Amino acid sequence: AFAAISALAISFLQMRQSNRQALFSRRLNLWLTTEKLMDVYSENAKHLKPSDEVQLANDLSFSWLTNTTSLQEIGPAISNVLDGEWQLKLHLKLDEMRSQASEARYIFKGNSGLAICHFLDAYQKLLFKMYQHQILIKTMSDMAQEHHLSLKEACADVHEEECREELFAAQDALSAAYRELSTRKIRGKIKRQMRLVNTPKDIVDTFLS
């Protein structure tokens, strides 16, 4: 009987360790992806500023924000906005980012999971808004050429200014999410959860606001 109980206890401990290792791997992979996106955003945030001008460099900004391993496959989508194949690739990647955002809430505890979720969700929403805006710019350009309109007239016809404000709102949302995730407190919580073995203090600190 003792041998059976010992074997059961060992099996339980092995399973627990295996689950802990699996959770650690999921956290590590998601955090590495998130950190790379944070680095890309940090390098290019200076280019994402509201202005009264038509956002003709929108495609360039999109290319900068997708210049990372996890997003490079959709970079060319901004130059092929009406191509069905590229549209599919973009939507699949944005769906993946939404799934990662949701996953963060479950595999990271407390506010750290929410902060990662907010950042990933805001990032994919901005990419989609930039893609939509590029369609608008192309439509506006084609209209101006076909009907011999000025840039200002074409902008008015497609309500570019209103759409531009929506783009800026998405930029502001990502900026706020980045600031939230960049705080020392949140990053400290994430770092503690990246350990395979947590001390009692780590566990308490993780749940403290």
Question: What is the role of each PLM region?
Answer:
Residues 2, 36-53, 76-78, 82-84, ...:
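Terminal, low-complexity, charged helical segments
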Residues 1-25:
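Membrane-embedded hydrophobic alpha-helical segments
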